[in-house]
Amino acid sequence: MYPFSFDPSSKLPVTGIYNILLFNLFPLATYLVETFCFFRRWKIACTLLCSITVILAYRMCAVYHHVGYKDVSTFGLAYGFLIMMSLRTCFLSWRDMVPSRNDPVQISAVKRRRPFIRNARWNFVDYALSLRKYGWTDDVVPPYCRKVLTYKSLGIRTAVYVGAFCFVNCFKTRLSNWMLLPISANPWYIQVAFCVTSGFFSYLFINALYYLFAIIFVPLGIWDIAEYPLMMGNVSKTTSVNDFWSRDWHVCTKPYFRVIAWDPTIALTGSKFLASCSCFFLSALFHDFAYWSISGRCSPAFFFQLLIQPFLINLEKRIPLLRKYHYWVLIIEMLINGTYGMGVVLLKFKWKTCSQI
């Protein structure tokens, strides 16, 4: 099963605009029906539809694998995220935790922006569109206290991240054209610089895309502005490994990790360390979806990079002296991410200029 038994030869090329739309929209349609069954408390139907959604999203990576080295990583991320959404809905269904809106002001704003949602019968549509589920309560995810951004601040952040992304992209392109192939023929500091640049490239791309969706979807009423938390927060103020992963990075996916990984592991073992390991393992699978469709196999770099984090958190708790230095965690994360993490994965699987490596 994914990702270890994926056969690169089992490609599913899709031709024709109608077939492409059918393959892309069918997993989304089954998830919407699953959400409908969730609000009707039909557990068996919800479980069956969850299985169908996961299988369809899983196969979509094989569909896109035939594209080769083209930039289709966003599709892998989208379907990996859809799998987590579907699994979370199924888990909540069996725990009888059907959510509801908990903010009267937000309820009225949603109904004003989405006039087709007039009563509770259409809650499943609103819940499916609210990807991060903020503004909902299901007695599982603790309230997340955050600063709600204004639309002006969203626009400013979008411009900053897009500009920084373009600058790093130009630098990366010049560096990749100047480097020798294979990469091992270059000095070690050039290799590290290129991998670290790759990590920044991915970081800025994700942030720019996130805020671009914000300035488009908020005016259209698809998502409420209160549902947009800060993406990775203010990393410069991060003081510990735990802060980086639990507050800055996983702020958008924490509701899914808690329901699918944290709570079941705590119930079975009672160990917070094992629960943390299960969350990072799930995160590694989710990130691996982005490049599995391109490479045709999983990357051990993701699993090493993420599964080492619980040990760093545990080490930090045992050695209080480490918490006094605010930037050591950022240095460690950058080195791990750049030398044997996202940078290596991007280097091997993403850019056509280095596809021969």
Swiss-Prot record:
Q: What parts of the sequence cross the membrane?
A: 13-33, 44-64, 72-92, 148-168, 181-201, 203-223, 266-286, 293-313, 327-347
| Source organism phylogeny | Eukaryota, Fungi, Dikarya, Ascomycota, Taphrinomycotina
The question of whether Lipoprotein is a record keyword is answered with no
Q: What is its main location?
A: mitochondrion
Its record classes its membrane topology as:
Multi-pass membrane protein
* Keywords, in A-Z order: Membrane, Mitochondrion, Transmembrane, Transmembrane helix
Name of the protein in its database record: Uncharacterized membrane protein C3H7.05c
A GO cellular component term found in this entry reads: mitochondrion
Q: RNA-binding among the record's keywords?
A: no
Gene Ontology terms, MF aspect? O-acyltransferase activity
Species for this entry: Schizosaccharomyces pombe (strain 972 / ATCC 24843)
| Alphabetical GO biological process terms | lipid metabolic process
Q: Where in the cell is it found?
A: Mitochondrion membrane
